[in-house]
């Protein structure tokens, strides 16, 4: 399928959630590499990002096939959640997170809680 006929939100970068915290990059390459050449995999390594990853494919068609096949796939006793990366959504989520942290700080100050 030519790139011009692919839905605009479909791209070569996938965002994966609900991964086992024990998964390795090698296991990710083995799983996602079944659907085409993978350029890069970034596993979340902080408390907030553990269990997530970004997978970058060489081309959009391979990413699309992986997204279709692996969404809901049971891997390491976890059902994977696979989405196309959306930079606009990432921006909004980050802003919401900052607002939630600010609200949490206000509540902590109000009740004198220190963590």
From Swiss-Prot:
Keyword tags: mRNA processing, mRNA splicing, Nucleus, RNA-binding
UniProt region (Interaction with pre-mRNA branch site), positions on chain: 9-22
CDD domains: RRM_SF3B14
Gene Ontology CC annotations of this record: U2 snRNP
Subcellular localization, as worded in the UniProt entry: Nucleus
Gene Ontology molecular function: RNA binding
PROSITE patterns: RRM
Gene Ontology biological process: mRNA cis splicing, via spliceosome
Domain RRM intervals: 12-87
SMART domains: RRM
Database matches in PANTHER family: RNA RECOGNITION MOTIF RRM DOMAIN CONTAINING PROTEIN
Protein's job: Necessary for the splicing of pre-mRNA.
Name of the protein in question: Splicing factor 3B subunit 6-like protein
Native organism: Schizosaccharomyces pombe (strain 972 / ATCC 24843) (Fission yeast)
